[in-house]
């Protein structure tokens, strides 16, 4: 098993490195094994690139009467998502890369990617997001410090909950922790976004209902 992982990992990385070019119908610019492998590894380390481009294009981000990237996914879900549409809100016409999402949404990833990549963004490319830049854009350095501190407190609290026997709290902690480690390359609210969706709570209610029914039968 260890041998398979040792041998298979470079091969998989090589295949994914080639796939980066093939999916865009672009000729592979590197022909050597090590060149393709190093090119793949380099393209995975784009976290700093998001920070650098975020600072560079910060003043060029679309300005609206109300704009908040930190809680963007949650706000867009309530205002222009499936839940917002139920209460009469106008849902976004597009769910993938588009000028609409790049200008009107509260998604930092869409807003910044359109500024940086322009036409390439409309073809489906993107540079992602970073919770640090979202906090900085919305609240400045003070916001980065305070909310990062709160994240640390939340992380400790969830670890404590994980050792208790409360099933629901334990499940919620696992759900948040699943995305928390990707936050440097993702949105601030992405980790707990599912907690605000109807789909998530619908599944939770179904599980609770079925569990109670099975308990009664036993």
Predicted regions located by residue number:
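A diffuse structural propensity rather than consistent per-protein peaks
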Residues: 1-2, 70, 108, 167-168
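Hydrophobic alpha-helical segments
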Residues: 3-7, 124-218
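Small-residue-enriched transmembrane helix-hairpin modules in multi-pass membrane proteins
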Residues: 18-151
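Hydrophobic alpha-helical membrane-interfacial segments at the cytosolic entry of transmembrane helices
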Residues: 2-17
